[in-house]
Amino acid sequence: MATIKDVAKMAGVSTTTVSHVINKTRHVADETKQTVLDAIKALNYSPSAVARSLKVNTTKSIGMVVTTSETPYFAEIIHAVEEQCYRQGYSLFLCNTQNDPDKLKNHLEMLAKKRVDGVLVMCSEYKDDSRDLLKSFSYLPIVIMDWGPVNPDTDLILDNSFEGGYLAGKHLVDNGHKKIGYLSAELTKVTAKQRYQGFIKALSEANVEMKSEWLFEGSFEPEDGYECMNRLLALEDRPTAVFCCNDIMALGAISAITEKGYRVPDDFSVIGYDNVHSSRFFAPPLTTIHQSKARLGERALRLLFERIAHKDAKRETIEIHPELVIRKSVKKIA
C-alpha cells in the first residue's frame, strides 16, 4: 500500500506539499498540484482518515445509536438520517442496543475512539443507568431523538406522543365512537404512556370512559397486536374501535379481526400510530398518526451540526408535532 512518502518521491516534492494538496490547507502552484495528483492516481494512494482527522479536527462521520434498525419506524428514520448525512458529505456509523445499557456504553466508547464528530441517540426506553451513562459522554456532541432523558448535556428532539395520542382519541370520538379500546406497548415505556395519556384526555373531554378491560399491554410488535386483539374479541362486551400504539400492532390487530370473520371498519374501527410507509397498503389503508421521519432526521442532524460547530452553546429542546392521516380504517357511526 502506497504511503505519502511514496507520493512525495514520485512527484519530486516534500511530504508537506503533498499534505497541503490533499487537505487544501495552503496554496500550491497549479503545475506542482497536478504533479502530486497524478502521483496519487498512479499509486492509487488513499490518505489515512485517522491521520487526516487529527490535522483538520474532523472525521466527517456521525454515530447513530438506536434500539433496533429492524422495525419499520426506526428503519425509515435511519434511512432519512443516512440520506441527510450523504448529502452533507458525512459517513454514518449505525449501532443497535436492544435497550441494553452495556451495549449502549460499548457503542459510545467505540464511537468516541473512532473520533466521530457527534452522535444521534434514539432508543425506545432509557433506564437510570443509561441516563447517567449519557452524562459521562457529555464531551461528545449528542442529540437525543425521542422521549429521552432531559439533561443539560444533550440536545433533545421531542415527538410529542401525548399530542399524537390525543389526536387519535379525538378522531374516534368525533366519528361517534363511545366504546373504545387501547392496544398498548408496555405502559412503563415513556412513548406508550404518553400516547395513552393523550388518548384518555381526548376521551375525557368527550365524556367517554374507557373500560379497564379494554386496555391490553404488549410490545411494539405485530404478534402483540394480534394477541391483544384476540383477547379483546373474546370479551362479551367489546368496543367498536381500537387505538393501537403503533402501526405494526395495528397490522396484527387487523389480522386477528379478519381471521374471526369480522371486517375493518364495518365491524371494528382501527387507528394506528407512526404512519410507516406500508400503512397505506394495509387492507384497508390505515388511518394513523403521522410522524415525519424525514423531518425528524433532518432536524436532529441540523441540531447536531450546530452543536458540533458551537459546543458551548446552550442546549436546545425542539418539539415536532404529529398529524392525523385519515384513510379508510375508521367508520363513522351514529
UniProtKB/Swiss-Prot annotation:
Residues 4-23, 48-56 bind DNA. Disulfide bonds: none annotated. Hypoxanthine binds at residues 73, 189, 191, 220, 274. InterPro entries: HTH_LacI, LacI/GalR-like_sensor, Lambda_DNA-bd_dom_sf, Peripla_BP_I, Tscrpt_reg_HTH_PurR. It holds the Pfam family LacI. Residues 2-56 form the HTH lacI-type domain. The keyword Transcription regulation applies. GO terms for biological process: negative regulation of DNA-templated transcription; purine nucleotide biosynthetic process. Pathway: Purine metabolism; purine nucleotide biosynthesis [regulation]. Keywords: DNA-binding, Purine biosynthesis, Repressor, Transcription, Transcription regulation. Is the main repressor of the genes involved in the de novo synthesis of purine nucleotides, regulating purB, purC, purEK, purF, purHD, purL, purMN and guaBA expression. PurR is allosterically activated to bind its cognate DNA by binding the purine corepressors, hypoxanthine or guanine, thereby effecting transcription repression. PANTHER family: HTH-TYPE TRANSCRIPTIONAL REPRESSOR PURR-RELATED (PTHR30146:SF148), LACI-RELATED TRANSCRIPTIONAL REPRESSOR (PTHR30146). Homodimer. Consists of two structural and functional domains: an N-terminal DNA-binding domain, approximately the first 60 residues, and a larger C-terminal domain, approximately 280 residues, which imparts the function of corepressor binding and oligomerization. This is HTH-type transcriptional repressor PurR. It comes from Mannheimia succiniciproducens (strain KCTC 0769BP / MBEL55E). The gene is purR.
